[in-house]
Amino acid sequence: MPFSELYFNVDNGYLEGLVRGFKAGILSQADYLNLVQCETLEDLKLHLQSTDYGSFLANEASPLTVSVIDDKLKEKMVVEFRHMRNQSYEPLASFMDFITYSYMIDNVILLITGTLHQRAISELVPKCHPLGSFEQMEAVNIAQTPAELYNAILVDTPLAAFFQDCISEQDLDEMNIEIIRNTLYKAYLEAFYKFCTTLGGTTADTMCPILEFEADRRAFIITINSFGTELSKEDRAKLFPHCGKLYPEGLAQLARADDYEQVKAVAEYYPEYKLLFEGAGSNPGDKTLEDRFFEHEVKLNKLAFLNQFHFSVFYAYVKLKEQECRNIVWIAECIAQRHRAKIDNYIPIF
């Protein structure tokens, strides 16, 4: 056993045990079979009471809405996460902070986009993910250019380090906002990857494949979404994270791709990605590429729990819980809209 793992439990043993206990409460296939049989959201609430969610909706007045369920699911996850973060020592504390940065990026982009469409900031802030909240959020609406956004708001946040390649005097419009989102994510993933390799050991062995997949998924999606837009091939290539399995040859091929078939051809060279593209289709009843990516992400995150004495379980738990929230909200939406034909289109976890 490596020396560092010998002392792992001194600082982190309690929290690793705690996160494994939380993971044991993730809904099983039997729970989902019960949920999809519910006729109303009140039935859904009753079924969730028999799981680890318990009475988390007990204080909500009828009629229950999907947005309330969504908010409460996030709230429960955030309470668990913050409880662990507040008791963590370095370097686990920094690792857990890294987990929150992706939500901070999403929140900044949501606020800028909403402001661009003349939405009040007071209306937008409640829509932000609580795991990515930060003090300066409500001032985002004063920024007119990426440079202002950085200098006035983000310079004192952890996102400042990821923003160096985004600073320009161009006005914030739809295209620029998407470029900022993807540039921030590229810098974030590369920094997180570097941090995990620095930690080394089992954390690096289990986290790096997860982050490599996340980087490659973004490269595939950026390429597919860029078709038919004004984004040039050169600008598109600048948005690809360089910490995935596709780097460098696969990314060079994606940069030259002109249509979906050419993207699929790139995936052919990578066995795990080839399977994902082959299993996706656009016909009724087929799984979308996004669903296939989510399924693969769940699989990678579950693998993290097979090893002990490492930090990846904290990341994996948050991502599995996030997928569980998406599943419950999907089922709730289908029940609320009486659209049961697609109610089984959730991503099972265990």
Curated annotation (Swiss-Prot):
The keyword Transport applies. It is found in: Membrane; Lysosome membrane. InterPro entries: ATPase_csu/dsu_sf, ATPase_V0-cplx_csu/dsu, ATPase_V0-cplx_dsu, V-type_ATPase_csu/dsu, V-type_ATPase_csu/dsu_dom_3. Keywords: Cilium biogenesis/degradation, Hydrogen ion transport, Ion transport, Lysosome, Membrane, Transport. Its main location: membrane. It is a peripheral membrane protein. It comes from the Eukaryota. V-ATPase is a heteromultimeric enzyme made up of two complexes: the ATP-hydrolytic V1 complex and the proton translocation V0 complex. The V1 complex consists of three catalytic AB heterodimers that form a heterohexamer, three peripheral stalks each consisting of EG heterodimers, one central rotor including subunits D and F, and the regulatory subunits C and H. The proton translocation complex V0 consists of the proton transport subunit a, a ring of proteolipid subunits c9c'', rotary subunit d, subunits e and f, and the accessory subunits ATP6AP1/Ac45 and ATP6AP2/PRR. Belongs to the V-ATPase V0D/AC39 subunit family. Subunit of the V0 complex of vacuolar(H+)-ATPase (V-ATPase), a multisubunit enzyme composed of a peripheral complex (V1) that hydrolyzes ATP and a membrane integral complex (V0) that translocates protons. V-ATPase is responsible for acidifying and maintaining the pH of intracellular compartments and in some cell types, is targeted to the plasma membrane, where it is responsible for acidifying the extracellular environment. May play a role in coupling of proton transport and ATP hydrolysis. This is V-type proton ATPase subunit d 1.
